Amino acid sequence: MNGRQRIHGTGRARIGIGLATALCAISWNASASEHPGQDWYRVNVRMSSQVVAPRGLLRDSQHAATVIFARIHVQLKWRGQNQQASKVVAGSMGEPATHDLAVEIVPHAPSPRNVALATAMPLADSGVRIVVFYDHVEPLLQGHHAPQATVMGYVLAHEIAHVLQGVARHSETGIMRANWTDGDFQLMGTRLLTFTPEDVQLIRRRLAPRDATAGCS
């Protein structure tokens, strides 16, 4: 391994964060700092798999991703392949809506030239929003000291965060780094690889009730 692992490609649904979005995130964060008590937001995730993975791997990776998001007060509720997640419903005043997304694990990447672990479609309105390429992920699971389910959980967390942020961007450090380093995988082993403050802002701002982000588009 060359010390860096590309998380996903750059060819699908790529947009930059405009000045208005950045200013809105700053404004929302300033408001949040005045109210340190954080609300919990719920996200329903329906995951289906076309691969035969080691026993317990997918279940334990879901748990790992759940723990990662719980640290930023986002609750992931996992649904099986045949379980339909509830539809998005508007919360009452001061309560967030429930957000749904779907993850599919497929045996192979669509092209030999595609070296990404997965792809996320943050701008899609419905359907499968995340596709994980198991032939790319499997060697990664066996190449580091971190437990396999933990690494898989971080892959899921990275892609879910893209969808929740609603933009195709990466951070210079942390979970949302475009290319994970050996140091990142060591941090995964101790569950110390985290989202950056900006990543948390973007995720929670989009999950917050609309009245909490009035004026942001």
Please name every model-derived segment:
Residues R14-S27:
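Bacterial N-terminal signal peptides
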Residues W28-A32:
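Sec/Tat signal peptide C-region and signal peptidase I cleavage site
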Residues R55-V163:
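Metzincin-family zinc-dependent endopeptidase catalytic domain
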Residues G37-D39, A97:
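Solvent-exposed loop and beta-edge segments used for protein-protein assembly and interaction
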Residues M1-R12:
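N-terminal secretory signal peptides that target proteins for export/translocation
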Residues Y41-V43:
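Short structural boundary motif marking the start of a folded domain
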Residues S33-G37, R46-M47, V51-H63, A120-A146, ...:
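Metalloprotease/metallohydrolase-associated module, dominated by Zn2+-dependent proteases
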